[in-house]
């Protein structure tokens, strides 16, 4: 499966960056906000530190924070999916996970 980074620009010049996989688009700003919420969430959550899912989330957050952005789309999408899997069934109040369905990909410039 190919993961694409999509850049869209409004007439006013505002630029948004998205991650696209299987025609689903996630805005990187929302991923950043979700990670921020997840960090706060994990600080007050009784996770078993030996739980592999907990370790996976911690590693993804660390990689994103330290700028290991080689393959940014893959890393961001993986982080997105892990967060959705972990948090969706026990989503704390105020934490929103958003994902967009791409409908008109041809209207967006796909960055190389």
Language-model region placement:
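Short aromatic-glycine-(Arg/Gly/Cys) micro-motifs in beta-strand/loop hairpins
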Residues: 1-17
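Acidic surface patches and DE-rich sequence motifs
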Residues: 10, 20, 63
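A short, surface-exposed interaction/processing loop segment used at functional sites
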Residues: 3, 28-41
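A short, exposed loop/beta-hairpin motif centered on an aromatic-Gly-Thr core
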Residues: 14-32
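Short, mixed-charge low-complexity intrinsically disordered segments
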Residues: 36-112
């Amino acid at each position: 499966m190919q993961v694409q980074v999509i850049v869209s620009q409004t007439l006013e010049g505002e630029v948004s960056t998205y991650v696209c996989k299987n025609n689903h688009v996630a805005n990187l700003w929302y991923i950043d906000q979700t990670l921020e919420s997840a960090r706060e969430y994990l600080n007050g959550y009784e996770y078993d530190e030996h739980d592999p899912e907990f370790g996976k989330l911690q590693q993804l957050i660390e990689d994103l924070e330290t700028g290991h952005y080689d393959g940014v789309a893959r890393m961001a999408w993986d982080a997105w999916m892990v967060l959705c899997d972990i948090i969706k069934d026990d989503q704390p109040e105020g934490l929103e996970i958003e994902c967009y369905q791409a409908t008109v990909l041809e209207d967006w410039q796909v960055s190389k």
